[in-house]
Amino acid sequence: MKKLRASVRSHKKQPANHKRRGKCALSSSQAKPSGLDGLAKQKREELLKTPVSPYHLFSDIADVTAFRRNLLSWYDQEKRDLPWRKRVKEETNLDRRAYAVWVSEVMLQQTQVATVIDYYTRWMQKWPTLQDLASASLEEVNQLWSGLGYYSRGRRLQEGARKVVEELGGHVPRTAETLQQLLPGVGRYTAGAIASIAFDQVTGVVDGNVIRVLCRVRAIGADPTSSFVSHHLWDLAQQLVDPARPGDFNQAAMELGATVCTPQRPLCNHCPVQSLCRAHQRVGQGRLSALPGSPDIEECALNTRQCQLCLPSTNPWDPNMGVVNFPRKASRRPPREEYSATCVVEQPGATGGPLILLVQRPNSGLLAGLWEFPSVTLEPSGQHQHKALLQELQHWSAPLPTTPLQHLGEVIHVFSHIKLTYQVYSLALEGQTPASTTLPGARWLTWEEFRNAAVSTAMKKVFRVYEEHRRGTCKGSKRPQVCTPSSRKKPSRGQQVLDRFFQRHIPTHKPNSTTQ
C-alpha cells in the first residue's frame, strides 16, 4: 500500500509533452540558441563537411524559382479559409498581427486544424490583444484550453504575453532570433512562423508537414530527427523561402504537406511541384525499368552506405510504398502504462440537481493546475484499489454515506508518453448540505459548471461514463463491483475514522471564482 499514491497530492511531476504540429524533434521549444557559437558552431562545421550529393539539393536556381512560383500559384488558388489567416490579412497593427499568428501556431502544435478553429475563435473573442491575455487568470486560460491537450502550451502562451506587456513595452520581438531568445515556449519553428507571417522576415520554417514535403522532393530517407538531416532540412527551407512573400511561402509549404503531400495516400496528381519531386521520379523509374531500353534517371551519386540522406541500406526502397518511402519514421518508444482509480462523488444540490466533487492537481507536472475527480495511482495489478480510493476520499471528509462505492467501468486515455487506464467509481452522499466555507483545493460543481471547467479530456471521458450510468444507459456489468467500509474486516487504525469520512463539508464553488 505504500506504493499507492494519491495522485491529487503527490502525482509524479513530469513535464507535459511539447511536440509541435506533427514535428519531429528538430528544435526544442525549450532551447534558446540565438546563434551558432562554441560547440554548436563547431558541430555545424563538421556536419557541413560531410559530403552531400546534389541529388538531395536544389543546385539549380531555375529549380528554386520554379518551386517558389508553382507552390505560391497553387496556394493562391487552393488555400483554406482559416480564421487566423483572415485576421492577419486584415490587421494593420504589427503587434496584434504577431499575436494572432502566435496563438494559432501554439494551438496547432500536435492538434488538427478542424479542432483548433473553434478554440482559436473563442480565444480571440475573449482576449483579442496581448494585454487582455496578460491580465487574465491562469484558471481562465486553463478553462478555455480545456480539451485541447498539452495544457502547458496555454500557460506558456500567457507567460509570453505577460513578458511582452511587462518587460518589452507591449511590442513583440520582430525577428525569429529575438522571438526565440526572449519569449518562453517559442522555439525555432514558432519563431520563424511569427517572423515570416507577421513581419515578412525572409526565414524558413520546418514542421512535420514541411519535413514530409522536403524529404519527398529531395528523396531524403534518413531519420529526420538526426542532427545531420535536421540541419539539412532547415538549410533547404531557408534556401527555398520566397524573399518577396516569405510568410505566404511558409504557409503554402505547410498547406501542401497537410492537404496534398499527406503521410498516407498523397495526391501526387494534384501536387504543384510534382515535376521537381525526386520521390515521384523514383516511382516512375521503377515503372520504366521494366521496359526495354529505358532511359537512365538521376540518382544519388554517393554510395548508399556513405550518404547520410539516402534511405538506409537496412531499410531500402519498397516499391509498394511509392513516395511514402519518404520520410521514414523514427522508431518510437511505446507510452508507459499507468493505472488509476477515480471516483465521481455526488450530493444533492440546492436546486435539486446533483453536485459533483472536483479537486485541483498540483501547479506543476502533468495536467498542472487542472481539476479532476478524486483519484489515486495504482499498481499494475490493481490490487487494493477500493481501499486506496476510500483512503483518498477520506482526505476530503464528511459523514459516512450509506450508499456503497460503485464500479462504473473503465476509461483509457493516451497522453503523448503515458497510457493511463482509469477504473471509474461513483459515490452518492445523502442528505449533505454545502457549508459556507471553502476547503482549499476542492469544489462542488453542477453538471453544467463541470462542462465549462478547466478539466482534462480524460476527466470528460470519466464524466461521460458516470453520466451514462446515472441516466440508466450504461452497458456495464449487471452486478457492479462495490466496496463499503463495513465490508472490510478488522480495519486498521487509520481506517477506523471512515465512519466519520467527509467530516468537513465542501461548499459549492463556481469554476471562475477559485483562487490559485
UniProtKB/Swiss-Prot annotation:
Subcellular location: Nucleus; Mitochondrion
Cofactor binding note from Swiss-Prot or TrEMBL: Binds 1 [4Fe-4S] cluster. The cluster does not appear to play a role in catalysis, but is probably involved in the proper positioning of the enzyme along the DNA strand.
Site (Transition state stabilizer): 207
Xref: SUPFAM superfamilies: DNA-glycosylase, Nudix
Compositional bias of kind Basic residues: 1-23
Active site: 105 (proton donor/acceptor)
One GO cellular component, as annotated: mitochondrion
Motif Nudix box per UniProt: ranges: 376-398
Tissue expression pattern: Expressed in brain, spleen, heart, liver and kidney.
EC number: 3.2.2.31
GO annotation, biological process: base-excision repair; mismatch repair; negative regulation of necroptotic process; response to oxidative stress
PANTHER family in UniProt: ADENINE DNA GLYCOSYLASE
Cited function: Involved in oxidative DNA damage repair. Initiates repair of A*oxoG to C*G by removing the inappropriately paired adenine base from the DNA backbone. Possesses both adenine and 2-OH-A DNA glycosylase activities.
Protein name listed in UniProt: Adenine DNA glycosylase
